[in-house]
Amino acid sequence: MASPTQGQVITCKAAVAYEPNKPLVIEDVQVAPPQAGEVRVKILFTALCHTDHYTWSGKDPEGLFPCILGHEAAGIVESVGEGVTDVQPGDHVIPCYQAECKECKFCKSGKTNLCGKVRSATGVGVMMNDMKSRFSVNGKPIYHFMGTSTFSQYTVVHDVSVAKINPQAPLDKVCLLGCGVPTGLGAVWNTAKVESGSVVAVFGLGTVGLAVAEGAKAAGASRVIGIDIDNKKFDVAKNFGVTEFVNPKEHDKPIQQVLVDLTDGGVDYSFECIGNVSIMRAALECSDKGWGTSVIVGVAASGQEISTRPFQLVTGRVWKGTAFGGFKSRTQVPWLVDKYMKKEIKVDEYITHNMNLADINDAFHLLHEGGCLRCVLAMQI
């Protein structure tokens, strides 16, 4: 059924980031109709992620202002552009910052979940068709963010960047399956491929780290060691599968040596979920020689570099990275939603706060202060 607003410009509320580190401004934003290969989505719920905060802080070299941030959300298709066949108005969807065109060399390789089709546009805050934005305020364009821009009541995304999901799934919960939870689960299941009986170390017990722990427990890990400098996180972490807790501040030795001593030579798998290059090195060096695998999940600040002694790799350790946990977005996000509906993965447990779009600056403050895992915003003002 056609939407009454199909083909028209929609004026709606959005949280606009005009400058780094300045409060977001709730504005009346004009959202243009979708062009060929595009989908306009009514966003109902969006969560805040540290990646949004990172770009807002001004530390992201690809950060463009003014922009509409947000990339972890769920909504309903309002209208589609010419040639779009995989979704239609009324479909429940999750926008996906990691596209999946199924046609480019990356998608066809079977070796990665990366996709090359629209990256040249999403990386510079525009849409592929005309390299322009679909957002404006009083005639002035506002940049897109990560190809999603979910801090707006309506957004326009590429059709290769939207996953159709079970309409019975609660959108205020499954919006989390757009980023953090799949990133952690997939780092374990797809990137590291943790086996039953493994010893696992998780550095950083935020949402992504807890999802790593959950994934490790589901994979049958015998020990899941959580590493964080906040002791209060351990009680929460136990609910996600962490069996032991280590606070680096409570030890004189380097944390990698502490873990080597605790595990008879090192862990089988380690995951860095912070974005700190010195911790990335520690995560590698706490893994066992011969087969230890360390996965970089956290995103370091621009310009930072990782280092270790080559001997660490010569003796059999493997250093890997992961984006969106290796999940193919359009194919596997619906599968993750179905797993949630069958109670096979946690989602609700990551949500510590619920607020409205009007409260977005307070929500950012909560995230920055470490006072929440995930805050879900309803899009009303």
Swiss-Prot record:
InterPro entries: ADH-like_C, ADH-like_N, ADH_3, ADH_Zn_CS, GroES-like_sf, NAD(P)-bd_dom_sf. One of its GO terms (cellular component) is cytosol. An alcohol binds at residues 51, 71. GO terms for molecular function: alcohol dehydrogenase (NAD+) activity; S-(hydroxymethyl)glutathione dehydrogenase (NAD+) activity; S-(hydroxymethyl)glutathione dehydrogenase (NADP+) activity; S-(hydroxymethyl)glutathione dehydrogenase [NAD(P)+] activity; zinc ion binding. Its main location: cytoplasm. It catalyses: a primary alcohol + NAD(+) = an aldehyde + NADH + H(+); a secondary alcohol + NAD(+) = a ketone + NADH + H(+); S-(hydroxymethyl)glutathione + NADP(+) = S-formylglutathione + NADPH + H(+); S-(hydroxymethyl)glutathione + NAD(+) = S-formylglutathione + NADH + H(+). Zn(2+) 2 binds at residues 101, 104, 107, 115. Homodimer. Disulfide bonds: none annotated. Binds 2 Zn(2+) ions per subunit. Pfam families: ADH_N, ADH_zinc_N. Its cofactor is Zn(2+). Transmembrane segments: none annotated. The keyword Metal-binding applies. One of its GO terms (biological process) is formaldehyde catabolic process. NAD(+) binds at residues 50, 204-209, 228, 233, 274, 297-299, 322-324, 374. Expressed at low levels in the leaves. Its EC number is 1.1.1.1, 1.1.1.-, 1.1.1.284. Signal peptide: none annotated. It comes from the Eukaryota. This is Alcohol dehydrogenase class-3. Belongs to the zinc-containing alcohol dehydrogenase family. Class-III subfamily. Zn(2+) 1 binds at residues 49, 71-72, 179. It is found in: Cytoplasm. Keywords: Cytoplasm, Metal-binding, NAD, Oxidoreductase, Zinc.
